[in-house]
A protein has these predicted regions:
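A short, N-terminal "cap"/entry segment at the start of jelly-roll beta-barrel domains
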Residues: 1-21, 66, 104-136
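Ligand-binding loop in jelly-roll beta-barrel domains
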Residues: 1-6, 74-104
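A short glycine-rich, His/Asp/Glu-containing loop-to-beta-strand
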Residues: 3-36, 94, 98
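Conserved hydrophobic/aromatic beta-strand scaffold that supports enzyme active sites
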Residues: 25-27, 46, 70-72, 93-94
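Short acidic-glycine-tyrosine-enriched beta hairpin
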Residues: 30, 58-79
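A short beta-loop-beta micro-motif enriched in histidine and acidic residues
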Residues: 33-45
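Glycine- and acidic-residue-biased ligand/ion/polar-headgroup-sensing regions
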Residues: 42-61
Length: 136
């Protein structure tokens, strides 16, 4: 009958600039043993693993997550992601990005060598919606 929801994770977004931005909802899938090389994004976002397993390395710490596990990435802080070795893994995320990234990737690799390496992750964008953040 109705849709029930509960908050898994919340993060303040006070530091976002005012003006035109982009709200993106997408998913990222990895084959067994896939990884996302050390990278940053051009904006913050919440993630939730919906299949498989993943280890997130950031801020000098490693966190292993199973289905339902949620985490926040600030954007400019480098992150390395290692998917489970024995099964496909997938997470969904919502990010706030610069408006200029409409339809474009937000990932930026930290190490020059990683830019040319084959990437194992695949993306599916569900929503790319321009939004405006007004002054409080």
């Amino acid at each position: 009958h109705g849709v029930a929801s509960r908050t898994k994770l919340a993060a303040p977004l006070d530091h976002l600039p005012q003006g035109e931005l982009l709200l993106r909802g997408d998913s990222v899938a990895f084959p067994p043993d896939g990884c996302a090389y050390l990278h940053t994004h051009q904006g913050p976002g919440l993630r939730c693993l919906i299949e498989g397993g993943i280890r997130i390395d950031t801020h000098g710490h490693s966190t292993s997550l199973g289905p339902g596990g949620a985490w926040f990435e600030a954007g400019p802080v480098p992150v390395f992601a290692q998917a489970a070795s024995d099964r496909q893994s997938r997470f969904i995320r919502v990010m706030i990005l610069p408006a200029a990234l409409l339809g474009k990737s937000s990932i930026q690799y930290v190490n020059e060598d990683d830019k040319a390496k084959p990437k194992t992750q695949s993306y599916k964008i569900f929503a790319d919606m321009p939004i405006v953040r007004k002054a409080p």
